[in-house]
């Protein structure tokens, strides 16, 4: 089955364009993407009754379907559609949680081009209705992860629209954001930061 991105580029798995290497565990960051680490973290939270947070499925537009049998359909071609909201949502201590997760190889700033207008609009709506909304930002080269409240992201977004910087300086993320310590279980314990930032008043 062929998957294509909105721009028409064909989706390739790592196995399609790289030779398969034997698994070598790396307990520093375990070689995982931010998404994989967060999915494992959320599974840990659910299993231990801490929070119920899920990743929203990526919307797919089906283009071509074959029917080899009357009772069975086979998808032959589909496109990943651009997500209209954020990556994750759920409930913690009776409050609605909604957040986006992004990573960059940059060491000194986080590019705002990683976010889209519709995501910012969605975050504004969540905040308007009293939900907890934030972004989790990973500097992959430094292996550092931060939680930044959506209000601050929106502030930098508005500054960009007014002719300001097209990225958030790391020093500003350190100033307004909250460092998330990395561990084994859970890998990225962002709920402990959520507890401190949003519930310890």
UniProtKB/Swiss-Prot annotation:
Write down the EC number: 3.1.21.10
One GO BP annotation of this record: DNA repair
* Cofactor(s) this protein cannot do without: Mg(2+)
Site location (Transition state stabilizer): 102
Give residues annotated as binding Mg(2+).
Answer: 85, 87, 100, 119
Q: Which reaction does it catalyse?
A: Endonucleolytic cleavage at a junction such as a reciprocal single-stranded crossover between two homologous DNA duplexes (Holliday junction)
**Xref: Gene3D superfamilies:** 3.40.1350.10
User: What is the annotated localization of this protein?
Assistant: Cytoplasm
What the record notes about the co-factor is: Binds 1 Mg(2+) ion per subunit.
Q: What class of enzyme is it?
A: hydrolase
Task: Mention any Pfam family matching this sequence.
Answer: RecU
Q: Which InterPro entries does the record cross-reference, listed alphabetically?
A: Resolv_RecU, Restrct_endonuc-II-like, tRNA_endonuc-like_dom_sf
What are the entry keywords? Cytoplasm, DNA damage, DNA recombination, DNA repair, Endonuclease, Hydrolase, Magnesium, Metal-binding, Nuclease
Q: Name one GO molecular function term.
A: nucleic acid binding
What does this protein's UniProt record list under function? Endonuclease that resolves Holliday junction intermediates in genetic recombination. Cleaves mobile four-strand junctions by introducing symmetrical nicks in paired strands. Promotes annealing of linear ssDNA with homologous dsDNA. Required for DNA repair, homologous recombination and chromosome segregation.
Q: Which family would the database say this protein is a member of?
A: Belongs to the RecU family.
**By what name is this protein known?**
Holliday junction resolvase RecU
- Species assigned in the record: Geobacillus sp. (strain WCH70)
Ranked from the top, the taxonomy reads: Bacteria, Bacillati, Bacillota, Bacilli, Bacillales
